Amino acid sequence: MARGRIRSKLRLSLLYTFGCLRPATLEGQDSQPIQGPGFSRTVFCNQPHMHKKKPLRYRSNYVSTTRYNLITFFPKSLYEQFHRAANLYFLVAAILSVFPLSPFNKWSMIAPLVFVVGLSMLKEALEDWRRFMQDVKINARKTCVHKSDGVFRQRKWKKVSVGDIVKVEKDEFFPADLLLLSSSYEDGICYVETMNLDGETNLKVKRSLEVSLPLDDDESFKNFMATIRCEDPNPNLYTFVGNLEFERQTFPLDPSQILLRDSKLRNTTYVYGVVVFTGFDTKVMQNSTKSPSKRSRIERTMDYIIYTLLVLLILISCISSSGFAWETEFHMPKMWYLRPGEPIDFTNPINPIYAGVVHLITALLLYGYLIPISLYVSIEVVKVWQASFINQDLHMYDDESGVPANARTSNLNEELGQVHTILSDKTGTLTCNQMDFLKCSIAGTSYGVRSSEVEVAAAKQMAVDLEEHGEISSTPQSQTKVYGTWDSSRTQEIEVEGDNNYNTPRAPIKGFGFEDNRLMNGNWLRESQPNDILQFFRILAICHTAIPELNEETGKYTYEAESPDEASFLAAAREFGFEFFKRTQSSVFIRERFSGSGQIIEREYKVLNLLEFTSKRKRMTVIVRDEEGQILLLCKGADSIIFERLAKNGKTYLGPTTRHLTEYGEAGLRTLALAYRKLDEDEYAAWNSEFLKAKTSIGSDRDELLETGADMIEKELILIGATAVEDKLQKGVPQCIDKLAQAGLKLWVLTGDKMETAINIGFACSLLRQGMRQICITSMNSEGGSQDSKRVVKENILNQLTKAVQMVKLEKDPHAAFALIIDGKTLTYALEDDMKYQFLALAVDCASVICCRVSPKQKALVVRLVKEGTGKTTLAIGDGANDVGMIQEADIGVGISGVEGMQAVMASDFSIAQFRFLERLLVVHGHWCYKRIAQMICYFFYKNIAFGLTLFYFEAFTGFSGQSVYNDYYLLLFNVVLTSLPVIALGVFEQDVSSEICLQFPALYQQGTKNLFFDWSRILGWMCNGVYASLVIFFLNIGIIYSQAFRDNGQTADMDAVGTTMFTCIIWAANVQIALTMSHFTWIQHVLIWGSIGMWYLFVAIYSMMPPSYSGNIYRILDEILAPAPIYWMATLLVTVAAVLPYVAHIAFQRFLNPLDHHIIQEIKYYGRDIEDARLWTRERTKAREKTKIGFTARVDAKIRHLRSKLNKKQSNLSHFSAQDAMSPRSL
């Protein structure tokens, strides 16, 4: 790493800084007043005692990321648990169960609730305990703090206060947000790693103010005192506004002097800093907001099912209470032995209405088993297992980066199987974000003969098309190379050369893919405009914020740059002979080599001002003074921004440069324009004075003042040229897009790149293809910002949308494909309320949608429009900080762990290392998780309806007595133990088809998108199946057992024998039903299903052997009453078969007469080549993929249609000529 010299002797006269980062002191200037709210923080440096009383008492440095503490855990956690309707119902039921009205023992209601809620609370507690232990570890870290008289002592982080002077040493984390005062380097710079903040691994350089450089050792802080007035705490990591008041002077502060908590000091021995923000006031803690809470569609539907069952529960409870009131009034007087006349009795026939109301409470408790109490906790367990399978899938592990897939939340697993629209970023997502400098335009001449991947792919396609038409001759591939660019809207000549003088093969260089001998090895000196080329190279080498690092093995410098583009520019400058090798606070140093002779000249450029690149400015400017004393302004930025700032005499190369930029964009390259101007001393001094005033202001208008100041100097530029770097497609992107298209998914691309670049990347990854009609919606240029001009532009866009919608709707060719392309400026109008639904209507009818030049906010707005306008599940995928908004807005957010940092990953629900892994995440895991959760929930409701309604039938059968036919311990174990494990196995291990089949038949994914397994017809079907099973279980058992000689001594079965027999049938029916539901068995499923049945027999055997004081009427019920009775075993077999018979009949009917796709595939897989019905093979081959108009497969289909058309036309012509020959006299 390039470093400044370690301190030996300070030479302040040689120390300067970037003007925008370290302006000169303003003599005699008073501190600026605090301007309004948001800028009220005052920090007394080295005087922490000043901050112990209000209003200057700020937060401590103790941080806690836990959700609970010892006092709040139980109330807050219980509140979270009883937000769920089912848990709230069971809480009320458990409370009522302690009263005499309850038909159950109170523990049969309380124990399951305590178990389920306790399990969930235990999970919350464990997660919070992990967070607490992490907090303890962080708060106990130690750092050196100035106590007094120049003495520093170790102190825990949590005891660091605002105003403390802190000394941080190499590889230590910063304990709070600090203002950098000095460092071990004489020029006051330090290197900081911010991976914990933004995930970026490249080091950032920080620079102290010049005035604080003498504070270079412990003793220097003995009498140090200063005041900081700055902004209030806020979450913006990249801004800071404030002033330092020191020695009666005011110095402006900005982000380059701020060291943020949780970033690490690297490659610097030590730094001194003063604490500005502590604890939750630090920027990292201000950013620790939670991602928006997301719930899957299945979970939301599940709530409605719960409400439906609650309505059913209330309905049958009302029926039961009405029946009881009837019985009380008309039949109870005859039952004298019940002593119904007592006033306190609930069965008093004098007041049947009161008796019915009281019985309603009993009925609500009795039928509560219709609501599955263990549903929520079972789903949580299953989703955690599913997420672990996603995390451990080796097919989604990236060998190059060593990064696996990561399910950051388990709440949305099943939502992965219902995605309708994917909205993707381009750079770093579809492309690698590893830039190669490929071409450039200098002084109106284009350099660089190497073709981009997009050009090669396009030229190959065009060569094939032209060869078919006989327009070019075949040339051996080994002797051809394609030059020039390709335009999708017009046909160009393809130049084929076997040899050329522009290129000499060389070893690959990272970031530099340029090939053109005209600029290499000093050959540029022989070009027609060598001075302009020299200026171009110097802009590349000087206009940046990178840090050089010497590679000792190669002897070359590599660069820690803020973006891959910047690193590629520096690599290009180095290869052209202009090597950036050193940076200090005041200067950059360049080694210039003008020819192949090896002569090297080292030059120093004093950096006077640096106006950094932002997404709003879209440009970067450096003002330097060269060794001759000339002040130069060097600027690079988006072509649209640079061109509008050109001087009249600076447009000499505007025409050819514009043409080259268009060609580069069509080749899929990222472009920037380069310009410069010379400044005289007076002009610079006047501007710098005004700019410093803007820098020292504190207030909400500071950014506006700075922008105005930058505009004052960034004008009258002279255009020198443009750069073109290639951002290659990631591995497997075209194949992944093709597979997703075959699965029926729609893909939108949202990018900040220009339209030409986005279009050609679209062609490269098969989102666009030849023959696809491109609908480009653009806004016409309008001067001024008046309401009238905006109205005209809006009407023009609306007119374009209307015409496009009509064109698409009137298209009769079923194979016609449309692509919608719109830029950010136009999108601003298209997203307004009165136009957005017309835009959406057009977009959903197009095969692909590409939005260019869009801002991060527009990305999020587009996602919101698609999500709310279509009502379908949306997935947003990106890799950068500018993608966070759309990732959080989408139903599912997927982050890619790329070189742009980890902000997208930290905001996402799932993260993957490469876009290509999205195919497996959705088509395999999404499909599996959707079907597992859907079947699991349906089965839960089936078994609880089947069980709960038997209580209602028995209630009616016994005169609405409010009596349960089952022992309380049976009820206790039913949901929690005896039927819970098999359903968890279903949710975790079920596979209707294997992963290979999912990828081979991607159209299976549409089962989730169409919600085939969790629509209301499927849900009601399972409910009806549960109702049928309950009828069979109750009435068949009653019919078999009631009034029959059950025991060998002629005794009939009592209530407990009937209840135990019915419960046995329920356990068998429920577990056999889930066995029939499963398509994929492992030994785990067998153990859990048949083990649950065995567990029932084991329980009842042990329980019935206990003394009567514990077992009550169940004493010896299995070995003495049920087991010896053949009718018990016959009833179990008969009832179980009858209960599952309709499901077996339904499946048989469906598989034979109306099979679903996975049924056919299962038979194909099972029978292999012995399958007799060849129609099934043909059917599944044609249905293996959804009909799509994008992707490589769509290209192939279009080509096949084209060939068939030509063949049919040829055959038609031959038939015509044959008929003419037959009719000719010669043939006669």
Swiss-Prot record:
Keywords: ATP-binding, Isopeptide bond, Magnesium, Membrane, Metal-binding, Nucleotide-binding, Translocase, Transmembrane, Transmembrane helix, Ubl conjugation. Mg(2+) binds at D879, D883. The chain crosses the membrane at residues 75-96, 101-123, 306-327, 360-377, 935-954, 969-988, 1019-1041, 1055-1077, 1084-1104, 1118-1146. CDD domains: P-type_ATPase_APLT_Dnf-like (cd02073). Residues 1-74, 124-305, 378-934, 989-1018, 1078-1083, 1147-1228 are cytoplasmic. Its main location: membrane. InterPro entries: ATPase_P-typ_cyto_dom_N (IPR023299), ATPase_P-typ_P_site (IPR018303), ATPase_P-typ_TM_dom_sf (IPR023298), ATPase_P-typ_transduc_dom_A_sf (IPR008250), HAD-like_sf (IPR036412), HAD_sf (IPR023214), P-type_ATPase_IV (IPR006539), P-type_ATPase_N (IPR032631). There is a cross-link at K616 (Glycyl lysine isopeptide (Lys-Gly) (interchain with G-Cter in ubiquitin)). It is found in: Membrane. Disulfide bonds: none annotated. Residues 97-100, 328-359, 955-968, 1042-1054, 1105-1117 are extracellular. It is a multi-pass membrane protein. The keyword rRNA-binding does not apply. GO terms for cellular component: membrane. PANTHER family: PHOSPHOLIPID-TRANSPORTING ATPASE (PTHR24092:SF150), PROBABLE PHOSPHOLIPID-TRANSPORTING ATPASE (PTHR24092). Involved in transport of phospholipids. Belongs to the cation transport ATPase (P-type) (TC 3.A.3) family. Type IV subfamily. This is Probable phospholipid-transporting ATPase 5. It comes from Arabidopsis thaliana.
